[in-house]
């Protein structure tokens, strides 16, 4: 059985048969406020607890709230949480590559969100931004396989004809072995997590979780 890193959220871990698979890329997408960053932070916390001599590389393109991080991390050792805040798509690629060369003990890589800078640069030069995006994403799966750690990427979404999907969806769906869609419900804080793609678990399976001040439960 493939090793998994649990989120400690019952609904999420139940849907994923124990957590996020190691050695693969998992994609989480959903509208703003569905819990993508909270899930990424909670998984980061658990990675630090499970592998205290390893580091978590967290690429932040959204302006992560340090207050939110403190809420979810609690007394967890943040010295093992290495945040990368690139200024552009090309900087993201270069900085991530540099960090990977500096650290050989990694428990998790997170990119939150992977398509933020691409949307901006795509408006200016579609050809260059698409090529840079493909170059960046193409290094993630080999890294996950070689390092035997999970890579979690979150994605911004668009809506067309009533359907919600991630920007640059075709590239991301080809890259990702697991694809998860987070959905808001009418009850405040209640979310659905829907499994859109998995190599061994039933697709379109759904579980519930609650987005709280302390993370996802």
Regions from the language model: what does each represent?
Residues 66-68, 92-93, 117-120, 161-163, ...:
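Switch/connector loops and helix/strand junctions flanking conserved nucleotide-binding motifs
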Residues 5-9, 37, 89, 133:
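A conditional alpha-helix N-cap/helix-loop micro-motif detector
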Residues 143-217:
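Phosphate-binding/switch region of NTP-binding enzymes
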Residues 86, 96-174:
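P-loop NTPase motor core
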Residues 20-98:
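Conserved P-loop
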Residues 7-20:
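Pre-Walker A adenine-sensing motif
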Residues 94-102, 192-199:
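Short, surface-exposed amphipathic charged segments that create phosphate/polyanion-binding patches used
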